[in-house]
Amino acid sequence: MAELPEAAAAPGPVSYRFTWHTRFYTAVLDRDLFDQWTVTRSWGSTRNGQGGGRVTVVENFEAGMALLGVIAKRRERCGYKLQINKANA
């Protein structure tokens, strides 16, 4: 499995984008308007714009990073490749 970029010392938004042919999957760890940590996932096709999404509230930043790790393993098992965002590197 590819190594995920380390989170910055001060917790803040972390986003990952996975691609496979014409499919994409993104996962973003950030605070919402109620100051709760959430993992927002979205997926779909780059061809027709169809897709979906889900928001999961997590207990804290560390729990969110753990969930991102689980998501990354699952995406790689399905053939997706992680694209590193420069903001996370």
Located regions from the model:
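Short amphipathic alpha-helices within nucleic acid-binding modules
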Residues: 60-68
